[in-house]
Amino acid sequence: MLRNDTITAIATPPGEGSIAIVRVSGPDAISISDRIFSGNIAGYASHTAHLGTVSHNAVYIDQALVLVMRAPRSFTGEDIVEFQCHGGYFACSQIVNTLLAEGARAALPGEFSQRAFLNGKIDLIQAEAIQQLIAADNIDAFRIAQNQFQGHTSQAISSISSLIIEALAYIEVLADFPEEDIETEDSLPKHRIMEALSITDELLSSFDEGQRLAQGTSIVLAGLPNAGKSSILNALTQKNRAIVTDIPGTTRDILEENWVLQGKNLRLIDSAGLRETENLVEKEGIARAREAMSQAEGILWVVDASQPLPEFPTILYQKPTILLWNKCDIVSPPQIEVPFQQISVSAKTGEGLLELKQALQKWLNTTQLGKSSKIFLVSARHHSLLHSVYTCLTAALNGFTEHLPNECIALDLRQALHSIGNLSGSEVTENVLGEIFSKFCIGK
């Protein structure tokens, strides 16, 4: 699976910028780069930087800072040369074209990371974390990916694997020497399987929370028609995302908008106003609104302070809820006692929105990862394979209770190890690797 050629690509995003980076990796990275650079790259020590000019066939291309990282002390485990040139499209693209003319090959998406994996610099779990780091759009998603890239998830998986291997080795001894009549009901292999199950179960149980943290906390704006839900959504996000009119029932479907508040990602969900209606389309919208309220993690219950107080749905008392008295610029809200926070706002003037943001921030901080080293699963691939591990370990444990032959228990444990191998990459197929790394950007 290892490639012996030398690859190159632009490692920075396209478009205008102060600096662009061109990366070269492979056995001929130094010799190819040396032919287009004014300095002596072949003579440079590893992990040093040198300023010079890039040219080809005596034609000047750009000034660049060259970084040399010799194998195996590099990201890919191969010789790497990086050219830091002026930003924009033309300088870096001309450097790439020159490197291609000198014998390098254009890198495939994720090929640098794939080489790092194939050369043992990172495992597959860490490699996948690279793409998660790049794609993270909020602080929680970034920290989850950071923990994964630092190897915390891999360490937990390795612990599961070690426990299974220890149990399997003991069981195989029992299978090879059945005449010893060793008692296994409360023996070492059973205890090791139970330990492995405990770690696996903890990882699996983190998936839903990990998904929520990575994708954002869902908060639905709900209330009667014309209470100002859509106006508040637009005011918070500073976008004209939702249609606003004086006609009740304008919003008839779920409208979702991502909103980052102090680095925390929220999914604000605008919903249809709740009321009795015979309009089939609006009725469907109301049904979806109620479903959104049941699925959301928090509710902003919007009330028009100038109108009679509506009845509060039971679900408001079952979830984190903030009561928003809208239109406080024209009327003072009534004084009522409810078990959730009340904030007076005006979607029209912006009054009270700062207090609302502070309240949301305070609530979100209760779910903030901070510097916690807790591991969260966010990959569906990881969850599926770990679920397979859990199933196999459960079957193996039941094998003791049902007094199954040791060979049957060993078979379940080997299957669990196979799933772990697919997870870490030690037994993964080339097709799976291709699918994973093809989602990466070129140059990473």
From Swiss-Prot:
PROSITE patterns in UniProt: G_TRME
Binding-site residues for GTP, renumbered to this chain: 226-231, 245-251, 270-273
The EC code for this enzyme is 3.6.-.-
Kindly list the positions annotated as binding K(+): 226, 245, 247, 250
Q: Which residues bind (6S)-5-formyl-5,6,7,8-tetrahydrofolate?
A: 23, 82, 121, 444
Q: What class of enzyme is it?
A: hydrolase
Where does the signal peptide begin and end? none
Q: Which GO terms describe its molecular function?
A: GTP binding; GTPase activity; metal ion binding
**GO process terms (BP):** tRNA methylation; tRNA wobble uridine modification
Keywords, alphabetical:
Cytoplasm, GTP-binding, Hydrolase, Magnesium, Metal-binding, Nucleotide-binding, Potassium, tRNA processing
Q: Which GO terms describe its cellular component?
A: cytosol
- State a single Pfam family of this protein: MMR_HSR1
Cofactor details (free text): Binds 1 potassium ion per subunit.
Instruction: Give the HAMAP family listed for this entry.
Output: GTPase_MnmE (MF_00379)
Q: How does it assemble?
A: Homodimer. Heterotetramer of two MnmE and two MnmG subunits.
PANTHER family xrefs: TRNA MODIFICATION GTPASE GTPBP3, TRNA MODIFICATION GTPASE GTPBP3, MITOCHONDRIAL
Query: By what name is this protein known?
Result: tRNA modification GTPase MnmE
Q: Which organism is it from?
A: Chlamydia trachomatis serovar A (strain ATCC VR-571B / DSM 19440 / HAR-13)
